[in-house]
Amino acid sequence: MEKMYNVGKIVNTHGLIGEIRVIATTDFPEERFQVGNTVYLFEKNSKKPEKLIIRSHRKHKNFDLLMFEGFTGIHQVERMKEGVLKIKEAQLTDLEENEFYFHEIIGCTVVTTDGEELGEITEILTPGANDVWVVKGSDKKEKLIPYIADVVKEININDKKITIEVMEGLLD
């Protein structure tokens, strides 16, 4: 089976006409959830994904509201709650220089410019102006590393290694 990547989690239905409420896990919701695009639904207790074609997409508060072709009522989409939406690897688009997909960053080892290994990136937070990487060290403690030019000095995706410069107070 072709490699697939998460683009959203279905958290609830919305209204009565078959809309679902999605928390996007992609930096490109407008692109991923474009009308006519295909996504794959992985339901909690199902082994096989369901192919869905997006019929409509709109933003509502902090959610993306989606409707799929062939689904016209709440009773048809209630089962989708807690499902995960994915796309195939072939659907990924090329990024600009120094832009990376989350799956490329998660799992990378973080080292300082002095050569000290801090741990592995386990999660990426998106609180606002810049992403924040959660790095778990061998001591099981989490360190938060902002993805900014003053801190992140080199990203080597092939070697899964990221070099950072530790600013004063960053690891305290």
UniProtKB/Swiss-Prot annotation:
GO terms for biological process: ribosomal small subunit biogenesis; rRNA processing. It holds the Pfam family PRC. InterPro entries: PRC-brl_dom, PRC_barrel-like_sf, RimM, RimM_N, RimM_N_sf, Transl_B-barrel_sf. Residues 96-170 form the PRC barrel domain. GO terms for molecular function: ribosome binding. The keyword rRNA processing applies. Its main location: cytoplasm. PANTHER family: RIBOSOME MATURATION FACTOR RIMM. An accessory protein needed during the final step in the assembly of 30S ribosomal subunit, possibly for assembly of the head region. Essential for efficient processing of 16S rRNA. May be needed both before and after RbfA during the maturation of 16S rRNA. It has affinity for free ribosomal 30S subunits but not for 70S ribosomes. Binds ribosomal protein uS19. The PRC barrel domain binds ribosomal protein uS19. This is Ribosome maturation factor RimM. It comes from Listeria monocytogenes serotype 4a (strain HCC23).
